[in-house]
Design a protein with these regions (language model features):
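Structural/interface elements that position substrates and couple domains in central-metabolism enzymes
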Residues: 1-213
Length: 213
């Protein structure tokens, strides 16, 4: 799990660099995959009860015997900061489209820590939610897999199990549940005229209304 955490952290850091260079991360990964020994990892939020937790057991033990694990903790720091990073990028795109950030409405797609499951343990979507609401943004969450009562009890958030048709300035795909694939057209029609999808998973077809991580 520590190895997986570090591999994802590398891709997340490269994603931040590529964004500053004006490069699409998924395009770079596709090109890199033409090399026979390339190992594919994709950027995104890193949560769950394993990858985002287990490295701390190892780093705690290492420090208890007098060794500071720089690389492992650096990877954890990068992955833990992705919630803030994606919110910053979303807000930059809202501003670029002349939205009033504090009056914006955002829909988060998915709340579980991985696709097609109801498990919300250590989900980092909560980081995204909290950062967005700290800017005064009105945030809704849609996840057909997650138990709404569990989410309310453990995270204090309201989850819609069904897609409520409304208008949003941005729709952020956080978790790539299969059901979202069949709802792409409906979701795109729920955007305001200058609204956009912020696709963290590369699920939506490319268009001028889709921003990728």
């Amino acid at each position: 799990n520590t190895q997986r955490d570090l591999n994802i952290a590398l891709i997340n850091e490269l994603t931040i660099i590529f964004d500053k260079l004006g490069l699409d991360t998924l395009d770079v990964l596709e090109a890199a995959a033409t090399k026979w020994n390339f190992h594919l990892y994709k950027p995104g939020l890193v949560g769950g009860h394993c990858i985002g937790v287990d490295p701390y057991y190892l780093t705690h033990k290492a420090q208890s015997v007098g060794y500071y694990p720089d690389v492992i903790l650096a990877g954890r720091r990068i992955n833990s900061g992705m919630g803030q990073y994606v919110v910053d990028k979303l807000i930059r795109n809202l501003i670029a489209r002349d939205f009033n950030v504090r009056q914006s409405k955002v829909l988060l797609l998915g709340f579980s820590f991985k696709e097609n499951c109801p498990d919300t343990r250590n989900t980092r979507v909560i980081d995204v939610y909290q950062h967005l609401t700290s800017f005064g943004i009105e945030v809704s969450i849609y996840d057909p897999y997650v138990d709404a009562e569990v989410a309310k009890k453990h995270y204090g958030v309201s989850i819609d199990a069904e897609l409520l048709v409304s208008k949003y300035d941005s729709i952020m795909l956080c978790v790539s549940h299969d059901q979202f694939r069949s709802e792409q057209d409906l979701l795109l029609n729920m955007l305001t005229p200058d609204g956009f999808v912020f696709d963290l998973k590369g699920l939506f077809e490319r268009s001028d209304r889709v921003v990728r991580l």
